Amino acid sequence: MGSKVSVEESVRVVIVGGGFAGIAAASQLKSFGIPFLLVDMKDAFHHNVAALRACVESGFARKTFISYKDSFHDSFKQGKVVGINLQTQLVILESNEELSFSHLIIATGSNGPFPGKFNEVISKDQAIQIYENLVEEIQKAKHVVVVGGGSAGVEMAAEVKTDYPEKEVTLIHSKIALADVQLQPSVRRTVKEILLRKGVRLILAQKVTNLDQVTPNVAQENMELQLDKDSEVVNCDLVLCCIGLKVSSSSYRSALGDKMAEDGSLIVNDYLQVQGHENVYAVGDCAYINEPKMAYYAGIHARVAATNVRNSLIGKSLKSYIPGALSMLLSMGRNDGVGQFNGYYLGRCFVTMAKSRDIFVSKSWKEMGQTMPR
């Protein structure tokens, strides 16, 4: 990944957050031989891109949680970051422990509802069991409703209908077009066609008004979802929520509140440095960049930031990150998909081969230097 460099003893990069951006930054710094400490409140990386497959396939969840300690050893610290002191260059944990840094990479990611995101601070084995429990709930249900028709929502609906074609599956979305707004119209049309071909019922341009009164992820008979138009009611026995993604900003809000955009992400320059702080970088979902918040881009950000840490230490020019044409692959179940790469449409065969079969989990196990369980 990169040649090792000689650095002073005072150099230590602290990476806050162990999502896709965090593990990519850690792996890159490790290859450079630059001392780092990856900090996350959980004990394992969660491959949330593959979380939707873990909802329908028993045994798949154990492939989506990868131990930090087994990859990064003493360069990993489990703990919740509650503050950052930029003057003294300290990261403060909930336990009151202070971690010194010469450089800081903020990779806190985003939060959202289960099952697309998993935010509980429990052990890897307990987390895996929660997904296994959801598989059982989906198996029990006769009518599954997915709320939210963005990228996660359309993938979730496709996963359920692909593995359980006999079940009634309904997708409710507040807009007319499905998936990410920045995708080409042809890709978004294909998403709709795939769902309809699979037999998913689509309710578009409508919102659920009583979602806070419904228990998601648990199968129970005669649940009623109220829609905001025509007083329509949808009866179902399982609700899966794929809405409400928010940037995780609590760890840096007090220190960098004046550098935050409206959505809570951090304003960065072309080198991914936080505005006004040459030794502080923001990558992934918490970086304010005009592109969708995706694991693919998070990894690229992280490698650019890690490279810039190295370059700053050895006197080389910093590397710029300039967003290009959108690249996104949508897995529509294990046997279908659609997407685009650098603006070019990608059809079923390519996306199925590239993503839909294992949702890139093997790539993350390889990046973290571990063997994926079978």
From Swiss-Prot:
Q: Where is the lipid attached (N-myristoyl glycine)?
A: 2
Where would you find the membrane-spanning parts of this chain?
Answer: 13-35
Positions binding 6-hydroxy-FAD in this chain are 17-21, 53, 81, 285
The UniProt GO MF terms for this protein read: electron-transferring-flavoprotein dehydrogenase activity; flavin adenine dinucleotide binding; oxidoreductase activity, acting on NAD(P)H, quinone or similar compound as acceptor
Question: Could you confirm whether the keyword Mitochondrion appears in this record?
Answer: yes
- Organism annotation: Xenopus laevis (African clawed frog)
Which PANTHER family does this one have? APOPTOSIS-INDUCING FACTOR 1, FERROPTOSIS SUPPRESSOR PROTEIN 1
Indicate where this protein is primarily found. other
- So what does this thing catalyse? ubiquinone-10 + NADH + H(+) = ubiquinol-10 + NAD(+); phylloquinone + NADH + H(+) = phylloquinol + NAD(+); menaquinone-4 + NADH + H(+) = menaquinol-4 + NAD(+); menadione + NADH + H(+) = menadiol + NAD(+)
Q: What is this protein called?
A: Ferroptosis suppressor protein 1
Q: Which gene encodes it?
A: aifm2
Tell me how this protein sits in the membrane.
Answer: Lipid-anchor
